[in-house]
Amino acid sequence: MSKPKQGSVRERGDTISQEKVIEIKNLTKMYGNHVGVKDLNLSVYRGEIMGFLGPNGAGKTTTIRSCLALIAKTAGEITIFGLDSHRDSVAIRKKTGYLPGDFGLIPSVKVRFYLKYLLSLSGCDSTKKMVSLAERLQLDLDRKTNELSKGNKLKVGIVQSLMAGEDLIILDEPSGLDPLMQQEYYRILHEEKKRGKTIFMSSHNLAEVESVCDRVAIIRNGQLVVVEDIRVLQEKTGKVLEVEFRDTVNIDEFKFEGVGSIRQDNGRLVLTIHENLDSVIKAVSNHQILNMNLKTYSLEQLFLKYYAGGETDERGGA
């Protein structure tokens, strides 16, 4: 697989710089003969929200745990804040908030005391922020941990990660909130971004990544498929034109710049069009048409193509 190009950093005001907070070079992690991740290269910049998207088992958690030295990598280099992820892991963790996918709670402890205990381990003590976040996420600080629903347990993990994340917040599959709380969570993440914090979040939820992230890295079978600005991917979605002609046509007539693929399917001509739609329509109109249908090629379909191992669009930088 060719090495994916790093997409342009999305600019929103002046909060995103070219300073690399996370830099991963040729990361490989083997579990015996099984590949967790292979030759992974990725940079995450200060002040951006980077989505790390892929199906379950693609290598997202392995990458995150390698970054935080929770597992030993097989090969490669990882630096965070310019520090070695393994040698300087203690210093890195003091500036990093982390929500693991398997976040657990000590039973029968009030949420308030549990959060204060967790934060004391990282040297963070901000009762005011804890109370504010709990109010916004509708988390009862005086409930005991064993009395919490799954969604409220997740809120505890979210609050501790946001409080501990002095400069960097790493989130491993932070899903499970109800829709209203999810939107409030997104607003909080954007506020943290505006303060200059960097957020690296893994997900298998396309809607989540599209809603909150500046860029996205898509991983499949332990290897990166594409790293790109969300807006660029949205622009790539394009159209799918299906045309049934009365007579046989030469497909070379429709090979315009901006036409991604052309194929014939049961007597129909099927074109994926990223730009130059007018030129294609004019060429089509030179023939007798029996039926024609123009559909939008959605972002979801694009991601499914990457997931399924379909041919990668060269214009996307994969």
Language-model-detected regions and their locations in the chain:
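ABC transporter nucleotide-binding domains
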Residues: E19-I22, K29-M201, L206-R220, V226
